[in-house]
Each structure stands twice: as C-alpha cells, then as structure tokens.
Amino acid sequence: MLFNSVEFIFGFFPIAALVFFGIARRSHMAAAAWLALASLFFYGWWNWAYVPLLVASAAFNYVCGLHLARFVRARRSRAAGALLAFAVGANLLLLGYFKYANFFLGIWGSVSGNASGIGQIILPLGISFFTFTQIAFLADVYRGYVKEYNPIHYGLFVTYFPHLIAGPILHHREMMPQFQEARTYRLNLEAVAIGLTIFFIGLFKKTVIADGVAPYASPLFLNPGAPDLLAAWGGALAYTFQLYFDFSGYSDMAIGLSRVFGVKLPLNFDSPYKALNMIEFWRRWHMTLSRFLRDYLYISLGGNRKGTARRYLNLFVTMLLGGLWHGAGWTFIFWGGLHGVYLVVNHGWLALRRRLGQDPERTTTGGRVFARAITFVAVVVAWVFFRATSLDDALAILRGMVGLNGVSIPATLATYLTPSMRAALDHWGMTFPLGGGSRLVVQYSWIVALLPLVMLAPNTQEILGRFQPALNFHDGRRLVRLSWRPTPAWAAIVATLTACGLLSLTRVSEFLYYQF
C-alpha cells in the first residue's frame, strides 16, 4: 500500500487512527497491539507471502535481544559477543539472499554461460530498512542502551507503518520511550493538525513535483544513446529534482503520519542540495542511513582512531558498502565508491586548509556560492550512476554532459535566433534537428523553477520548526519567516496543496526508495 494512494488516504489511515485512539481510552497496550497488527496489514497489502518473513525476523531478533541482554547483565562478554555476531550475521544473510543473490547469480551466469535462476528471487518490500533497524537494536542491547523489552512495543517498533517501507532507520532507544508515554495514546488535535499539514505538503511534493518532472528524466536513462549537451544535462537535472522531491515527500509524509499518533520520527531529509560540501551533504541526505553507517560500520572499521590513511580507507569502504546497500548492481557500487572519493577529497582539503592556518568555517559569500554550486554538480554527476541501468549508459550520459556529443537546439527554437547568431552557432558545430522544441522548453522550465526552491527555500521542517516536528530537529535553528501557524491563511495554503496533491492521485507511482 502506498502513502500516495486513495485506499491509504481515505481508507487505511483514518481507520487505523480512529480505532487506535478509541482503543487507547481503555488500554494503551491493546492500542499498541492494534497499531502493530494494522501495520502488518499495511505491509501485507503489497504481498501477503512476505508477512511471515517480517514476523519471523522480528521474533528472531527479539529473542536474540532478550538473551543478549541477559549475557550483558551477567557480564558474560564472550557469550554476548558470540550471540551478537550470530544474530547480526543471520540478519545479513537474510538480507544478502533476497537482495544480492540475483546479482551474484548474474555474475556467475555471465562467466559460466548458465543463466538459470537469475531474476527469480523477489526482493521483499522494506527488508533493508527493517533489517538495519533490528541490527541497530541488537548493537544497542550489546552496549547496554536498551532498557525496555515489552514484546508488543518491540513488534510495533519494527512494523510501525510510517517507517516500515522506506525508513527512516530507527533506534530502539528513541522510539520505546514514546510508546510508553501516556500522552501518545491521547488524541491531540494540535498534533493531528501538524501531522496532516506535514503529510499533505509531502503528498504535494510527491504527486505534483516529483511525478510531474519524472517524464523529463526517464527517457534519457531508459534509452541514452548519444545525448547532446542539453539533453544530457536536462535529463540528469530532471532526475536530480525528481529524486529530491520524491524522497523529501516520502520523508515528510512519514513524519506527518507518525505525528498524528503522537510519535516523533527522526529527521531523515534536510535540504541536502544546500550543502556546501560532501560532508555536509551526507549530514542532510538520508540522515538515519548516514547515522547507521557511521555508528555501526565506519566506527567498527576503526573510524579516525588509526591514522589519516586508515581513516580515509574506512570512509571509502563505508561509502562503497553504502552504495551496495542501495542496490545490487555495479552502478550502485560505483556511485558509493564515487561518494567515498568525494568524502576523502573533502576531508583532505579541510585538513590542508587547517595546516595552512586557515579556518575552513570562514568563507566569503562568493566562496559559499561556489562551494554550493560545485557540491551540487558533483552530486548530479553521481546521480547519473545511481539512476543508469549500466555503467556504459552512465558513461554515455556523462559524455553528453561534457559536450562530446555536440549541442543541439530544436529547429523550432532556432527560429528565434537572428541569422548571425544561427550562423555563429552552426560554425561551432551546433545542430538544429526538427521536433522536440516544446519538450525541451518544458523540461528546462521545470529545472529553472525547482533550482531556487531546493537551494533557497525553507524546508517543511523549518516551516513548522516552532512545533519541533522531528526528534533531531535541534533547538538551535533560527526560525524562518515563512513559519506555519494555525491561521486561515495557512489553512488556505495547505488546502490548496492538498487539493493539488489529491487531484494528482490518478497517476499513482511508487516512491523511488521503495526499491531499496
């Protein structure tokens, strides 16, 4: 079931919420159990065959967590370490089978010539997210962070539908206290208003913006051929904005849905294209995945404790595996490795500036504009590998982006040029093919309209900042002028966005991160 579907918005969600608050008047535990069962129904709407897998995964990790906690309390460190290794290994084997078996079967098939079995393993929806969430739980138990082991609360923690399909990746210690609080189970009209506002802003981002710009991105990646400069950049930028508003929309909708139930999720998306460098980008993009990779992979590899060279190697390996987490394919591996190189160069540059006695935090306005622009271009280049179906296709698009395939302006647009301008462009090798003029205009109109939005406009969490919309939305932020309040003006704005979002449900599409 999709957040951006009629059956969810007008069926599942209102029923789940009304029954939850109705049951909660008599029993908080029964209400939590209802929400867990409703979440399983939500998951099963996609494919009921994988509901037992989700339940078995939750039961296995819960039992392992109980035994692990006993070993930790008894200070049986060797037994605790062995159980942790076994449980994490079992989770990774499960994830590896469903997510990577087809990839390795494909490699074997290309080597051996035997293609049997390739593509027959279907990836269960959300398996990467609920697996990583539970690995984090096991690690937190081992470290002594987990204090509560109620089985119903744990089941809700794993299956909780606002995060189940595409994140955020949760920590047990940040969710369990909320499931225990009495106020979570009381209907709060302010929380409902805030939650629905965030949800419908997210719906607008997904159905109007992301799905609206998608047709101007997909053709390039489905059949790249030898795109010219304008076609290559147009498609790459269109996808850059499609992915941004798709993931931003999903993140808003997840936070908004959860807020209706009185539960705050961690912030997972924070205007990443405003980043001045790649380090900052990964503090803003898929923030809970970045947190997981840092806490449970980068630090486990040694972090920055074993010298500069080892630190850079750890960064690169972490991002390489982060790319592999996104998908079983060489394009994802290359994307992760490229971001690993970006981070190594970024850290090296900052270290060099410090050695030269410069303060990396101090920069001019022009320097900030340049830093943001070069970071954005680097991200766009990396997205080409992320979206392309093969490395050859990605390289073909990049060749077009650097102008190796020439530049073409549709003949219909060339009619607006003066004869001297057209002659000059023709001299420089520009071609003027027939057709495609209106499409190119619309494509670049989207790009011109969306670029200032992602670079300058406040995001949803900032607009609702005074209400602390997410767990890690820190207090030190300066409130923006465009700040939401329960006023008639804001009601009209949100109603307009809601109407546009709902009217666009005729072209329902999955969120891009559902495939991971």
Q: Which sequence ranges carry the predicted segments?
A:
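Membrane-embedded transmembrane alpha-helical bundles that form the catalytic cores
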Residues: 1-515
